[in-house]
Amino acid sequence: MSVINFYELPISALAIYLKSTTHLNQQDTLPLSISATTEPSYPIGTNIDIYHFKQQWQQLHKQSIKNEPLQYISSTESIEKQQVDWLINLFDTVFAAKNVVLVRGDNDPEYFPATATHPARIEFAHGFFQSALHEISHWSLAGAHRRTLPDFGYWYAADGRTEAQQKAFEQVEIKPQAIECLFSLMCGRSFRVSQDNLHADFDTSQSTFAIDVYHQAQLYINQPQNLPTDAKTLLTVFAFVCHDTIETGR
């Protein structure tokens, strides 16, 4: 099977669409409810200071590609950690009204529903930026009911699955990984699918998973109205905050 190049996806077309259907207010912020010109507005939770987050992202992006020192972070802290801190702050700000927080986990990812005293927690694995994007994609797809269930009520079998279990796993993962792909590309990060099957004892060479994820991502770009609302919200923020930096930095 040929290698799938996810960078070929026209992410700029999606960025242009999202920005063209969204208005900034005079303070260069995304307001409480993003105002769309061609479809109903969707809630964002609070005013988002685009300049603040964009300035930080520009510094982080510059450091990551040119290894230049940053003014506001210690040289002993990794860029990955700073990017994760930035993402947590952005996510928690954007979705403040959703009673959910993004949490750096020490172990495997897990979702904990909100309680009477604590917000829901999206815990991603080992502090990795990519894991955070993946778990956010699952959250964005989960409806109101599944967000009340531990791990969204998902069935999960660990690595070492049977061939039938692997096929079921891949079927469930197509849309989350397609959304993760769009998040990644909008942030200028690389993306590759995860089949999570390092210990498979069967032939995986005929799997169509990668191309299925590619086609689903392509479908979301061509029909952005089919994106989950919260995924669309975050992609819109990334389009304003991250994508211009990527385009001018290449």
PLM features: residue spans?
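Auxiliary, metal-adjacent structural segments of Zn-dependent hydrolase domains
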Residues: 2-12, 16-116, 166-171
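Pan-zinc metallopeptidase signature
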Residues: 3-4, 195, 199-250
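N-terminal secretory/membrane-targeting helices
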Residues: 97, 101, 185, 242-249
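Short pre-active-site segment immediately N-terminal to the catalytic Zn-binding motif
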Residues: 115-131
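Active-site recognition of the HExxH zinc-binding catalytic motif
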Residues: 130-143
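Post-HEXXH active-site segment of zinc metalloproteases
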Residues: 142-173, 195-200
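An active-site-proximal "capping" alpha-helix that borders the catalytic cofactor pocket
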Residues: 170-186
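Short helix/loop segments within enzyme catalytic domains
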Residues: 182-197
